[in-house]
A protein has these predicted regions:
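Beta-propeller folds
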Residues: 1-486, 492-497, 768, 773-777
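Short beta-to-alpha linker loops that shape the active-site pocket of alpha/beta-hydrolase fold enzymes
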Residues: 143, 161, 405, 551, ...
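Cap/lid segment of the alpha/beta-hydrolase catalytic domain
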Residues: 214-224, 516-641, 645, 660-661, ...
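Short, contiguous acidic/charged loop-to-helix segments that flank catalytic cores in large enzymes
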Residues: 363-365, 387-391, 423-424, 441-442, ...
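Mobile cap/lid helix-loop segments that gate and shape the active-site cleft of serine hydrolases
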Residues: 567, 596, 608, 652, ...
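Short beta-strand immediately N-terminal to the catalytic nucleophile in serine-hydrolase-like folds
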Residues: 629-631, 656, 703
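Short beta-strand/loop motif that positions the catalytic acidic residue
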Residues: 696, 702-704, 708
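C-terminal catalytic histidine-bearing segment of alpha/beta-hydrolase fold enzymes
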Residues: 701, 714-777
Length: 777
């Protein structure tokens, strides 16, 4: 779906006041590092370490009531995303906090109500998408989550003018639960996916046309992802792409027939336990076979298969990016299974032939392979992100322009940007001004701003967002209009989120679509944490450090704020300090730091956290006898390593859905960091928890849902078996039939247990809680 309606989902963010602290190591600008956890995860991509410490001063000298767990689940404390989208060069649609959906026209600055909030209540709909011709809306209801991005839902087609309603179902099927449904790019084009086959409607009144017939439940997927492609490769549900004029549809066929099956038991609600099976490849096992097809939507059903480059086998490759470049041209990125070589192809969809435009190789792994290149109109030149070596800090990601000479054979390559910072996204190329628009971290590793650079003169570069809302926003997402005249800026922190619309020629002229007024009001009388930022010198590296400290929100000053996360309750009400250290494995600090964990997870990353903790314990306001650790998934793995290692400084720790053995995790992730088990079995062994020998009386709290499809309960079962053999005490809290992301009620219960655990641990012997990586749930 293009947009989602109703109240925004609970988002992991917290409120802070920003305060810069002088660096311990080399001078850097860390302003704005305290952005939301969601943004931190995007920025760091792998590691986001937090240490929770107890302050020696337990007396409150601040006003305002502390944050509570109940606050976290109130709508007024949650972020609202207006989900603004361009529907033409001069028009956007967006949704306000009250649920009403509007269209804004840049030509006359008028805003028109398209869809009332009462419509969602009438049809019990929670998702929506508006047709390109603005006549119809697709309403999704009875939504049932499958994995992180995928869901089943039933759909209605609602006429915005006559208010007539019709169900969207495959032929001869009623009350269907569809795997996907959305509009095309022209008029009322519509596709939906049922039982892993793609259906097409040329318009609302036309009959459905089944485009594929090979779909098999849980085995062959057409136009949507299986578990591996959804969670580890494409990172979304859809696996199809419209041509610009809507005349063709490219789609993946993912065949899991040889992929081993994982069983997820369901214990409650029946006399005997039931369960579901799904295909889940682990390291060294068969991966899905994948094929790319293009079908013509003129009624002929002509389908062309796009073949991979020579040397790539369908089961030993990933298709990580597909993008239409012109009406008949498609760019595709093919990555080998080891993820250390990629080929960017430009394909003629009428003939099925491709030419190689660029090849990348690495002796570790290749990062950012989902990033889409930007082509010129004639496809002779394109812009992509490539590593550029820096003399002292390793390589950083920068914009490279690659073009063919007049002969069509010789290729030139030159970088438009350089420095010890990363380009994160290339947004657009404006040929009328020879300008490339992009997002980068030039202002600091935890900042992201909008920039423009000239293709003719790379020294002609400017930051378009750096001077906007300085006290509130240092991390932006951006979406440019198709004519590169306007931009939607989504401020993600460190202050309250807001969405604004700007003219690129005059960025200070803007309209605000959403400024989180409800959240601002909710936080007005709450005791909101503040942050301090430092750098920590560890060996030859200078790592980022963030401390979240108890402090009241001064209502007479304009403090940057972040949204509420559960640690904020600890900080606000229990005088506990949260610390995060971005050690080896984190992004935007050069490839030397990023690749430092290659084949060494649980070793050098744990060393970085331990060394950082030793420096933290020297601070006068931290009680060194009260230190704990928290983490989920990879963070649960790392927190367990830190807690149970020899001479650990941690008193207690929590591991939520911990990865305990990388051989048990998904193939794409495990093989990326460790390689193939036949060659690297020893690397897998030293990075598992089987080597733990600690018998100290630390307190370990393990939390896991039994129906977790991402990190299976098998991991916690192996950990419990190991701890029992070592006579190490532990507490286990399971959530029957719950997945990797808990339901709202279970999440609230879990967080209450987490809070009680830390309070008990810290009260027993003057104790800190360290939080390792958390995911963007």
């Amino acid at each position: 779906m293009n947009q989602s309606a109703g109240a925004a989902q609970h988002t992991h963010r917290y409120s802070v006041e920003e305060k810069d602290i002088g660096p311990v190591g080399p001078d850097r600008n860390w302003k704005g590092i305290g952005i939301s956890l969601l943004v931190i995860l995007v920025v760091l991509s792998f590691i986001g370490l937090s240490i929770v410490l107890l302050s020696k001063d337990t007396g409150s000298k601040t006003s305002g009531s502390p944050l509570t767990l109940d606050d976290l689940f109130q709508r007024s404390f949650q972020i609202h995303d207006p989900d603004a989208k361009w529907i033409s060069a001069k028009e956007i649609i967006f949704q306000r906090w009250d649920g009403n959906v509007f269209k804004m026209d840049m030509n006359n600055n008028k805003t028109e109500l398209l869809l009332k909030n009462t419509t969602f209540a009438t049809f019990k709909a929670s998702k929506f998408a508006i047709s390109p011709d603005l006549n119809f809306v697709l309403l999704g209801y009875d939504v049932k989550q499958v994995h992180r991005h995928s869901f089943l839902a039933s759909y209605l087609i609602y006429n915005l003018y006559t208010r007539e309603v019709q169900e969207l179902n495959p032929p001869e099927v009623s009350n269907s639960a569809l795997q996907f449904a959305s509009w095309g790019v022209q008029g009322q084009q519509l596709i939906y996916i049922f039982e892993n086959n793609i259906y097409y409607k040329a318009n609302v009144q036309s009959s459905s046309w089944r485009l594929t017939s090979s779909g098999q439940d849980g085995v062959v997927f057409n136009g949507i992802t299986d578990w591996l492609y959804e969670m580890e490769v494409l990172h979304h549900q859809a696996a199809h792409w419209w041509s610009p004029d809507g005349s063709r549809l490219a789609y993946l066929t993912i065949n899991d027939s040889l992929v081993p099956t994982m069983f997820l038991p369901r214990f409650t609600g029946s006399l005997y336990p039931r369960g579901t099976e799904y295909r889940y490849p682990k390291m060294g096992q068969n991966n899905p076979a994948v094929g790319l097809h293009v079908i013509t939507l003129d009624g002929s059903s002509f389908t062309e298969e796009i073949k991979p480059p020579d040397g790539f086998h369908t089961r030993e490759l990933y298709i990580t990016m597909v993008k239409w470049v012109a009406q008949e041209k498609l760019s595709v990125r093919w990555v080998n299974r080891a993820q250390n070589m990629s080929v960017l192809s430009l394909c003629d969809t009428t003939a099925g032939s491709c030419i190689t435009k660029h090849v990348m190789v690495s002796d570790k792994w290749l990062d950012g392979q989902n990033e889409k290149p930007v082509f010129s109109r004639d496809s002779t030149a394109f812009f992509t992100i490539m590593p550029l070596k820096h003399s002292s800090h390793g390589a950083f990601n920068h914009i490279a322009m690659i073009s063919n000479h007049s002969s069509g054979k010789d290729v030139s390559l030159h970088h438009l940007t350089s420095g010890t910072w990363d380009v994160t996204h290339i947004l657009s190329y404006d040929e009328s001004t020879n300008s490339v628009f992009f997002l980068s971290t030039e202002e600091g590793p935890s900042q992201q701003h909008l920039y423009r650079v000239s293709v003719m003169d790379s020294s002609d570069k400017e930051c378009l967002s750096c001077s906007l809302f300085r006290s509130n926003c240092t991390y932006y997402d951006a979406a440019l209009s198709s004519d590169c005249q306007h931009v939607l800026l989504n401020c993600r922190g460190p202050g309250l989120p807001q969405t604004t619309l700007h003219k690129l020629s005059s960025m200070r002229e803007f309209q605000t679509l959403d400024e989180s007024a409800e959240l601002r009001a909710a936080l007005k009388n709450r005791r909101v944490p503040k942050t301090e930022r430092r750098t920590v010198q560890i060996n030859s590296f200078a790592f980022r450090l963030e401390l979240i400290l108890p402090m009241d929100l001064d209502e007479t000053q304009k403090h940057p704020l972040l949204l509420v996360l559960w640690e904020s309750v600890l900080v606000s009400s229990e005088h506990i300090i949260v610390a995060r250290v971005d050690g080896r494995g984190s992004s935007f600090q050069g490839e030397e730091i990023l690749y430092g964990v290659h084949q060494r997870l649980g070793t050098v990353d744990a060393q970085d956290q331990t060394t950082a903790l030793e420096q933290l314990l020297k601070l006068p306001y931290i009680d060194e006898s009260k230190v704990g650790v928290y983490g989920k998934a990879y963070g649960g793995f790392l927190s367990t390593v830190l807690l149970l290692s020899h001479n650990s400084r941690f008193r207690c720790g929590i591991a939520v859905a911990p990865i305990t053995d990388w051989r048990l995790y998904g193939s794409a992730c495990s093989e990326k960091y460790f390689g193939f088990p036949a060659k690297e079995e020893y690397k897998y062994q030293i990075s598992s928890l089987v080597g733990i020998t600690a018998t100290q009386p630390q307190e370990l709290f393990i939390i896991h849902g039994t129906e977790d499809a991402t990190v299976h309960f098998q991991h916690s079962a192996e950990l419990v078996k190991l701890l029992s053999s070592l006579n190490v005490n532990y507490t286990l809290q399971i959530f029957p039939d719950e997945g990797h992301t808990l339901s709202s009620h279970s999440q609230q219960f879990m967080l209450s247990s987490v809070m009680a655990f830390y309070k008990r641990c810290f009260q027993e012997k003057n104790t800190v809680a360290l939080e390792t990586s958390k995911e963007d749930d």
